[in-house]
Design a protein with these regions (language model features):
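Short, Lys/Arg-enriched charge-dense amphipathic segments
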Residues: 3, 15-16, 21-22, 27, ...
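Amphipathic alpha-helical coiled-coil segments
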Residues: 65-81
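Non-DNA-binding regulatory cores of transcription-related proteins
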Residues: 78-148
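Short, compositionally biased
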Residues: 148-156
Length: 156
């Protein structure tokens, strides 16, 4: 049948709606990350009954599925002691003569511009298990990063 004879409401011609991709691997979270996920689920659940636009309802339901899945699979990481770099730690280091501070967090909590980087990011992986005073290879350079300080973040 010709497209001219189809109703405008046929969903066949709509752009496909994809689910939000869930990062591979474990869903490690800090206490803050778990609280953020729980708050997002509560926010979406509260907003859903108030939405009137069908497209917005569909998008909100999709978002809610994502955040409920993240909440259901969240694994609260054990508290770090700050002796070595591990999930949840803040790390101050020197790279290319510049000092930086990052905190290793879960995927959903990551905000690189704020210094919160995902534990699966290449920089995080390079830093893992390092100790103060260690020099680490990164970006194809030996001794590219010097670990200056490690701080265990509050998980309560």
């Amino acid at each position: 049948m010709s497209v001219a004879f189809r109703r405008d409401s046929d969903e066949e011609h709509l752009e496909p709606k994809f689910e939000i991709p869930i990062p591979a691997g474990p869903n490690m979270v800090t206490q803050r990350g778990l609280a953020l996920i729980q708050a997002k689920v509560a926010e979406l659940e509260a907003a859903l009954p108030l939405i009137e636009d069908e497209a917005h309802i569909v998008a909100t339901k999709r978002d809610l599925r994502y955040w409920r899945a993240r909440q259901a699979t969240a694994q609260l990481a054990p508290a770090a002691d700050g002796d070595i770099v591990e999930f949840g730690c803040s790390v101050r280091f020197r790279r290319n003569g510049k000092e930086q501070l990052v905190t290793l967090v879960g995927h959903d909590e990551a905000e690189p511009a704020s210094g919160l980087i995902s534990f699966s990011a290449p920089l995080s992986q390079a830093l893992m298990r390092a100790e103060v005073g260690d020099f680490i290879a990164f970006g194809g350079q030996e001794d590219a990063i010097e670990i200056l300080a490690i701080t265990a973040t509050d998980r309560s």
